[in-house]
Amino acid sequence: FKNLHQKGKFALMAPTGRASRRMAESTGVDEARTLHSALGLCTGEEVGDGERVRFVDADLVIVDEFSMVDMWLAQQFFKRIGQHTRVVLVGDPNQLPSVGAGNVFYELIHSGMVPVTVLDWIFRQSKDGLIAYNAKFINEGSTKLYYGNDFVFVDSPTQIETARRIQDIYCKEA
């Protein structure tokens, strides 16, 4: 975008500080912000009908991890972007939906109202690893899974025992 539009403004956003920092690191752009910060929602004040909104001054806005965005935050975002601003929403519709109300990213993708591009290149896990392999099976509705060093099944009789075993495994790995 910077190469094509030297005078164009763009904004990088994500729902969490961790995701925005990772976005900044992976793009080499220093100014990736949380949605709350970029939208002026960090004051702790309730946002009512008469609020003074901070509009996003950008020609292009890219929001990563959009599957984590609930209905309220999505509404705040969409009412603060300009009519001619291009928006790219990045996320995984197969991840757990937002903690708050709504499965906004999934619904947008399946609405047929917005163009969708599916990226099938795996960045965070080994392409040949069992996590990616099993994720594909799970997304297809299959229960046949493969186990190995990077994908294990921990059987336990109770929730408390499950938590203890997970903690033990985590401490050994860390």
Regions found by a protein language model. Give the residues of each.
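Conserved RecA-like ASCE P-loop NTPase motor core of nucleic-acid helicases/translocases
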Residues: 1-27, 88-90, 151-166, 170-174
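Conserved catalytic network of the ASCE P-loop NTPase/AAA+ motor domain
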Residues: 4-5, 53-55, 79-84, 109-113, ...
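Short glycine-/polar-rich loops that comprise or flank the Walker A/P-loop
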Residues: 8, 58, 83-86, 112-117, ...
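Inter-Walker segment of RecA-like/P-loop motor cores
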Residues: 8-60
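Catalytic P-loop NTPase motifs of RecA-like helicase/translocase cores
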Residues: 39, 68-70, 96-97
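Walker B catalytic acidic pair
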Residues: 64-66, 91
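Short, conserved "post-DEAD/DEAH" coupling segment immediately C-terminal to helicase motif II
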Residues: 71-85, 103-108
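Conserved helicase motor core of P-loop NTPases
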Residues: 93-174
